[in-house]
């Protein structure tokens, strides 16, 4: 009898969320661990009649698993497409040869195109453990990648994912580097640009550390989980879409690396550029506008860093054959009023519907970005883009196009707000002098956003605005009293993150 035929266990779903890391749970004294010499954190190949994955071993010492069972984390279960009681075979994995490039980078070697290809291929293939992934992320953190290394990493990321060919040019796109709550211009921009005859198939992300991503916000108004075939049908019909990028495998290695970056709380200039540009190239974009908000509590805190980031993006775009342009914007305070999926969607609709109460700052930002894209795309002359965008918005053409896109994606619905609300008011007379973007984002998340799409924070004031005692500053919306209580506890513990100063005479 072959060894493989002995090394089998029956699979059991145990309902543990390991944050996308495939983990297999085995009795320490089961026959497979003993015969193969598996230890805690061993990397093993798990094979069924349908699929094969690599997972990390966690060993169990008590009786909640039998000696004949192997438990799978949610991530492993999903990747393996397993069924309860299904037979799986276990074996050692080969050493990951590309780790030599990671070690080399840690000791000062450069990342070549060949080494980047090997590392990224293994990352996307699930060969790296979280420890090995952390080593690679650390090796590339900060400003440790030069422009050619960034371009090599970006190219490698594109190679391991799907790449969409729309069969025409130009294909317009935009991206915001983030860090600014409420800056949800994308649905407005897509509506304006496509209403003017350009193609803009927008794949957007869900929130990672923010209270809402564009996909989360759009999902409160229309379905966003589109297959590639569905995306192409919507774009063919309407000229654009606003879909969740995770539903098509555009840059699978990037999704893995982002998870590790967030866990380590590491910002990598090079990996940020590679992440953005790889997904734009894979999405088939030819002309990309990057929105870089600058502010002391935004992701990008200085004009110098913004310019360096923009330079990296332009250089990498040229290397990969797309046109990239950057636009620097004000990141001193949240944009619009709503922070959280449904609240941001409400602001978007107010702008598209030309309502009097629509947030002026969100409207101006969207018109500025859309106007520049119209110029880049050749449907407006230089300097005339904003006027063309404004005309498209005010005529109702942008709203009509947005509704058509929603219907093509599965149907439009009005976003709903959470039932529990607390209104924070000013405790003094003065002028709003400071708003901490990170505090506002954390407050919205504690209220339940983005998992509860109707939760979040609704701002009533802007920097420089005069307020009186008792005047509303912002409202917190939550689905449950407990979530509202979490947010209020945080608010009480951080009293100076929104400051009011006496007006100078």
Swiss-Prot record:
One of its GO terms (cellular component) is cytosol. Keywords: Glycosyltransferase, Transferase. It is an enzyme of class 2 (transferase). Its EC number is 2.4.2.4. InterPro entries: Glycosyl_Trfase_fam3, Glycosyl_Trfase_fam3_N_dom, Glycosyl_Trfase_fam3_N_dom_sf, Nuc_phospho_transferase, PYNP-like_C_sf, PYNP_C, Pyrmidine_PPase_CS, Thym_Pase_Put. GO terms for molecular function: 1,4-alpha-oligoglucan phosphorylase activity; thymidine phosphorylase activity. SMART domains: PYNP_C. Signal peptide: none annotated. GO terms for biological process: pyrimidine nucleobase metabolic process; pyrimidine nucleoside metabolic process. It catalyses: thymidine + phosphate = 2-deoxy-alpha-D-ribose 1-phosphate + thymine. PROSITE patterns: THYMID_PHOSPHORYLASE (PS00647). NCBIfam families: ARCH_P_rylase, PRK04350.1. PANTHER family: THYMIDINE PHOSPHORYLASE. Belongs to the thymidine/pyrimidine-nucleoside phosphorylase family. Type 2 subfamily. This is Putative thymidine phosphorylase. It comes from Hahella chejuensis (strain KCTC 2396).
